Structure formats: C-alpha cells, structure tokens
C-alpha cells in the first residue's frame, strides 16, 4: 500500500503521474480517496491512508539544525509524518533549507503559505492556512523516515 500527501514537489518529479498511471503493482490509497463521492467515506479513507505501508510527501522547510517542518490547513497531509505510516519518504528541493528552526517557520509563514493560499484558492475556491504544524527533530525508529534532498528547486 502506498499513499501520499498533496505536494507540489511530488507533481514536479512526476510521482503523482506514475502513481495514477497504474503501471506498477502498488495499491494506491490516494486514488481510492479521490474516487469516493461521499465526504464521510472520503474522511474514513483519508484516516486509513495515513497508516499506509509507504507514505510519500514533502516538507515546507528544512533547518540546517536538522529539523524538518511541514504544515497544512487540516493536518491530512502531515498526519502520517510523526508516526502513522510504516515508512515515510519525503522529497524536498534544496531551496527549502534555512539557517535555523526560527527561519524555517518564518519561511513557511511568509513565503510558502501565501503561495499555497493562492493555489488552494484557485484549485478549491477557498484559501489555506497554517493550521497544523509537524516538526520532525529526529526519528527514533531505524530506517522509517527517508528524506530525498534534491539539489534543485522543487515545490515552494
């Protein structure tokens, strides 16, 4: 089973296209969510999807001090990050690196979320907010979390 949080980065590296293509042997939990017509059933599927064997996503900022910062309005994208998913794979562009945790959070508030708000307004007809924050300082479960840091601009 594989699922993913909504992340511009995953679209830019064509992972979403690959997942939607069906040219693999993966059970795509995110596709099941999008197919569901009823909101209550969608919410149940979203809760199940964060416990997938593999969950892919991105982060909004990376502090040179080691913290990974992810934020979204409802928490549905970042819920898998702290514990729920068996394996977490995060992909991020190098432009997300900041000098400190404080600067990383500032980056999210002042740069990332105005862009995300505009994207959400266009995509869903309503804006976004910095509702739920996840800060990963260290992973205590060996080999659970993988950060793929790409030396180019991915996402925002």
PLM feature segments, named:
Residues 1-56:
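N-terminal active-site beta-alpha-beta segment that forms phosphate/nucleotide-binding
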């Amino acid at each position: 089973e594989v699922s993913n949080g909504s992340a511009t980065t995953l679209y830019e590296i064509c992972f979403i296209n690959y997942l939607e293509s069906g040219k693999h042997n993966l059970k795509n939990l995110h596709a099941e969510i999008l197919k569901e017509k009823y909101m209550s059933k969608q919410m149940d599927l979203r809760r199940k999807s964060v416990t997938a064997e593999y969950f892919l996503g991105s982060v909004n900022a990376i502090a040179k001090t080691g913290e990974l910062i992810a934020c979204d309005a409802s928490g549905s994208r970042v819920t898998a990050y702290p514990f729920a998913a068996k394996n977490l794979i995060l992909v991020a562009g190098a432009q997300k690196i900041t000098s400190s945790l404080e600067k990383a959070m500032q980056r999210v508030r002042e740069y990332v979320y105005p862009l995300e708000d505009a994207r959400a307004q266009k995509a869903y007809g309503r804006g976004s907010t910095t509702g739920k924050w996840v800060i990963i300082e260290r992973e205590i479960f060996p080999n659970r979390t993988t950060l793929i840091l790409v030396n180019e601009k991915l996402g925002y």
